[in-house]
Every structure is written in structure tokens, then in C-alpha cells.
Amino acid sequence: MDSDNSSNLIDQEIYSVYNEYEGIDIHYGLELSCIKGHIDVFKHCISRGALVSGYERMLYSDWINSPDYVDLLSLAAYNGHFDIVKHLIKSGFDPKYNDYSALNCACERNYLEIVKYLVNYEAVRYLMSAGLKFRLNVTNIPITKISELLAVEQDFIATNSSIDSVKNLLYTSTKNYFSNVIDASLVYAARGGSMDILMYLLELGASHNFAIICASIHGQLDVVKYLLQKGQEYTTKIEYCIIMAAQYGQVNVVKYLIESGNELDHNLDYCLKVTMYYGHTDTVKYLCNRYGERCYTSDCLIMAIEQGHSEIAKFLIVDGGIQLDNDNYIKTAVQRGHINVLKLLVSLGMDFTINKNLPIRIALRECHFQIVEYLIGKGVDIRSNNGYIIRWSLHGNSKNKVSRIIKYVTDNYADMLNVIKF
């Protein structure tokens, strides 16, 4: 089946939905056309009375290539349907709706044509609201004619406004409200790695300290490099970008920023711990290999154990040479129910019978029955000392956990019920 026939079938399927019903179904067809880009379907829905202004709803997970909560203009912008974007605005949809969501979607998805159109459109509207004159590079137009041009000539703004004209409009001696919107849009472009849009917005004069942080978080290394090379004076320290990149596991960004001369000074410990907390093994290894023994501490190992990151724990012990001389390591693993970490510690020689079999007592008390079975399999006798392990786990415990422990004992060690006082 060729693509044209396929598109026609899709159109016919959408038509069948809203031709049979009234009301919400034409809006459903309108929504589909914004997602799929079917301009004929869109126009037909409008002619049938579908409303575009203020229409939004939650989209569920079965919708592909759409944000979670959107309006129609954002849907069209997110999916790159320029014709739909223009028709929505012509039909009365306000680009400012939902805090310029459509502009931000287009920035993040790298649809430069849509971004330029929305920016230029808002530049004109700003001048209209200010009662000023709009001067294009190609001609001078009285302000009274602008609204007519917007309604009649769809492509006029997009095709005739140059960067210089828009820049002069937006960035006067006192920055206006829309210049702040452009600054915010730069963040979305940085997050999406949209280099063309990033350069366009920067050429307009956009500036936002959060853009480089956002690019670092999302691993947009090219954006990070470009912003640094632009030489902007960021009020936020690059060290914070390193920490955020490390927190999200963007090891390439971390490596680039550090090796560009931005060493972690006073925040190494925090950066390392937050990276371990989220379990980014490659980033942890890079930081440890670069900063050496400063990273191989008991606190770092406890952090890895608490979060159940057995691979990081193994790296710190085996490669970092951390000694297993702290009973808190095995107690923490059992307390948190991390059986893989417990197995690692036992395999490396830690004693699982410390303090009168405290690990299995903790495991039973916390209802980590998989760990209980593992330790029994390693030789711990749950019946020893007249059921002391079971009695200890029941004493002072919550009603919910007591009932679960009793059920476990009943199902697996019914002979112990006679010697346990509940």
C-alpha cells in the first residue's frame, strides 16, 4: 500500500468518527488532526463547529509522540505540523495559552519554522498592545493594518520578519514581558538539544542561566559546549551543572565540564553521594578514578548499600579497597531488604551471624522473608535457643508485621508455634 492511500484511509477513519456523532466527536477529530497533521480533516472539523480556543484534555499513554497534558496548539507544534499551527491561530487560538506551551514544545522538538512564526507573531502583537509602529525590513506598515494582515495573509509574518527586526522590537532598553518568554524558551531548546533554535534564540538576545543547567541534566553535550563557547556570564556556577549532570547520570557532560578546567572543590563529597544515591555506576567510577582515595569512604559505601546498588558497592570494596570492618554494612543491607547487596557482602567474607544472628532477626522483624530464607540456607538455625529469633522479631513489632510473621512461621515452621508467646 502506498503512502497516499494509507493517508486517505486514515482520513476516512477520522471522518467516520465525527460524521456519525455530534459534539465531542468533532473535537476528537480536531485533536487527531493536530496529532497526525491532516489539514483537510482539521478544516472540516472547524466547518462543523469544532471549537479551538481553550480546548484541552488529558491524553493517555496510548497516544504516541504527544506530551501528557496539552492543548491543541501544543499538540500541533509538538508534532511539527506548521500548517495546523497557522490555522489554529487564524481560528482564534491564543499562542500565549498555557504559558506559551506551544512555543516551548516547538523549541524542545527542534521545529525552527514554527518557533520563528510564533516568535514573530507575538512580536507583532506586543507592538499592537503597546500602540507602536511595526517596521519590517522590506516595508513600513501602519499599525492599523497589522491585524488585517494577520487575518488575511497567513505567511506574512513568518516570511517577512527578519531576525534584526524582531530583535529590535523585543530587546529595547527595558526588556518587555515577551523577552522573558524567549529566555524561558531557550531552556526548552537546550533541554531538547535543538541547536538551530538555540542559536536563533541566542541571536535574538535570549539569556537564561538555567539553560546550561537544563542541558547538563538532559545530557545535551553539544548544547553545553556551545553555551560555554559563547562566553556568557553565568550567575550559576558550572560546578552546579556538574552536580546536576552527575545526579542524572550524564557522565559525558560531567567528564567534559571537569576536564575543561572546572574541578569539583568543596562539593566533591556531595556530588559523589548524590550520584551513588541514584545509582549511576559509570559516573561514580569516573569520579572515583579522577579523585582517588577521597571517594573511597565508609559513608559512600553506606550510601550505595542503603540504595541497593550492589555494583557500586562492589566497585568501592574491590577497586577502592574499603575494608569490611563495619557491622553496619550488613545490618543496613538487611534492614533495607537488599538481598543482592547482602549476597555480595557475604561473598566477600562478611559475617552474617554477628550479635547472635542479628541479621536474620532484623530480616524477620522487617518481613524480608527472602533474606530470611537465604540466611537459613547459609546455615542459620531459626529454631535455635527455643525460637529466640522468632520471639525477638515479634516483640514490640507492629500489628501488621506481627500477623505477617505469624503467617510465615505457620506456613513454614508450624512446630515452633507451641513455644512462641504471641
UniProtKB/Swiss-Prot annotation:
Keywords: ANK repeat, Repeat
One Pfam entry name: Ank_2
Source taxonomy: Viruses, Varidnaviria, Bamfordvirae, Nucleocytoviricota, Megaviricetes
Domain of life: Viruses
Signal peptide positions (record): none
ANK repeat start and end residues: 25-54, 68-97, 99-127, 181-206, 207-236, 237-266, 268-295, 296-324, 325-354, 355-384
Entry-linked Gene3D superfamilies: Ankyrin repeat-containing domain
Keyword Protease: no
Name the UniProt record assigns to this protein: Putative ankyrin repeat protein R789
